[in-house]
Structures are given as C-alpha cells and as structure tokens.
C-alpha cells in the first residue's frame, strides 16, 4: 500500500523515473538522497552467461538546476562455454564514478525539459569478460522530456555517447571503444505515485572514440515500473530484452558479441 500522503501527489518527477534512461528533473537545492541498484545482464551464445553490477550512490543538489552524485559499484560474472571468453565465476569491487547533471530548460516553465549529463568513471573489471583491467571512460547524455498529458503521460528522449579506454592486466594491451545511440521512453501514471511504461534503446558499438570502426548494433525494448512506496522511498524495475541486432562480420538477427540478450535493473532511493 502506498503512503497515504502520496495519494494526492500528481506532478510527475523525472529525476528517477526510467530504468535505463534519464529525465531532466534534478531536485531542489539542498536535496539529499541515497540510492541502491543492481543491473543484471544475461544471454550469450553458445553457453551460459550472467553478469550483475550492484551499486550504491549518494546524491546532493548543491545549487538550482545542478545535481551531483558519487557511485561505488561491484561486479559479478558467471561465464561458461562462451566463445571468446574465459570461464569464470567471481565477484569483485569494480568502479568509482561521479555524475553531474545540469538542467538547461525547466519543463514546467517551457513545456519541455532539456538537460545534459556527464558521468566519468574508473573501473578495474571488464564489464563483459570479468577480466582484470584498468578502464577509464564517461557516459555523456543529452536529455529531453515532455508531458504529453499533464500529470498523466510523459515522453522522454536521450542521446548517449559512452567512450572508454581499457588497459588489460593480462596482455598489457590498450583498447578504445565507444557506444553511441538514441533512446526513447513513455510513462503513464495509472495511480498517484505509480507509473508504468516502456523504453526503447538503439545502441551501436564502435572501435575508437571517433566511431571509426563499426562493431555491432542492438535494439532493446521492454517495460518499466516506477512506484513511490512512501513520502521518501521509491523503487524502479525495468526489463529490456534485445529484440534485434547484428554484430559486424557475423550473421544472425542479434548482436550477442557486444551486447546481451537481456538486461534488467532494480533501483531504490531514499530521500532526506
């Protein structure tokens, strides 16, 4: 049952609303929040593949229109009989990241919201293979959202660029890769504090920061649920299967070289 004080809340807040996308809301100056999440990825050929990344985030809004946060994350891999990957079952501390989101246009005033987001990170585990590495990268996003029906239906669009350089501890080699693509989502408030919807992401993987060599592409589409459980506590659950894709130099209707068959996320937040 939802907290009774939420029953009259109608305004849609997009700061935490989607599973794999980002909204343009950033909170109010002085807001503090802690968040926990786990992203799971599974499904590669021909054997068994599962990876999970539990994370803990602390967030603060220092000034109007600016949201800042820091995140610690771990990595777990269970890999067996996957072409090109060593069998392993391991868990380890993985990465540290810092996120800055700045809102350029406020949705309630202009009719649409516009923001930019940058999250540089350092990691010590390869997210696909679980191999020990040093990796340096960033998630850079352009964010747009608009209420199609006030306090009822909201649409969002993201454009994402994710460059990353990786240094292998095993071979000493450096690699430079990037992922680029758009994402779109729609959420409907069916009850005060409860929204359901869907997200679609079209991602292209490249070798090189300047998108020099195409490596593969994937289209993900799946449902998202947001629920405010109390005045201060919320939860998000999303599942995003790959419905189409292709890896470079490989036949088939999916890209299971650069991406997974399924991605899922569960996230909760506690506001102060």
Predicted regions and their residues:
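N-terminal signal peptide c-region/cleavage motif recognized by signal peptidases
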Residues: 4-6
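Hydrophobic alpha-helical targeting segments used for export or membrane insertion
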Residues: 1-2, 272
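Transmembrane beta-barrel domains of Gram-negative outer membranes and organellar outer membranes
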Residues: 9-272
């Amino acid at each position: 049952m939802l907290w009774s004080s939420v029953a009259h809340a109608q305004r849609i807040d997009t700061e935490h609303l989607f599973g794999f996308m980002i909204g343009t809301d950033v909170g109010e100056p002085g807001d503090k929040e802690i968040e926990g999440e786990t992203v799971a990825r599974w499904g590669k050929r021909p054997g068994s593949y599962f990876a999970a990344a539990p994370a803990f985030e602390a967030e603060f809004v220092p000034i109007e229109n600016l949201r800042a946060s820091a995140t610690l994350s771990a990595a777990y891999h269970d890999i067996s009989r996957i072409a090109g990957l060593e069998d392993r079952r391991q868990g380890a501390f993985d990465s540290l990241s810092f996120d800055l989101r700045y809102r350029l246009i406020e949705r309630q005033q202009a009719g649409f919201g516009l923001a930019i987001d940058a999250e540089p990170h350092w990691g010590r585990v390869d997210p696909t293979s679980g191999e020990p590495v040093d990796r340096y990268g960033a998630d850079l996003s352009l964010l747009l959202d608009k209420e199609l029906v006030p306090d009822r239906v909201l649409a969002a669009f993201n454009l994402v660029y994710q460059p990353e350089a990786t240094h292998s501890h095993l071979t000493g080699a450096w690699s430079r890769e990037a992922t680029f693509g758009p994402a779109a989502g729609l959420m409907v408030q069916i009850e005060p504090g409860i929204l359901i919807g869907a997200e679609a992401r079209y991602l292209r993987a490249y070798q090189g920061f300047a998108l020099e060599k195409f490596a593969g592409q994937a289209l993900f589409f799946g449902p998202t649920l947001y629920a405010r459980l109390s005045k201060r506590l919320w939860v998000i659950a999303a599942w995003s299967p790959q419905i189409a894709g292709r890896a470079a130099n490989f036949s088939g209707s999916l890209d299971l070289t650069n991406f997974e068959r399924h991605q899922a996320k569960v996230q909760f937040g506690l506001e102060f």
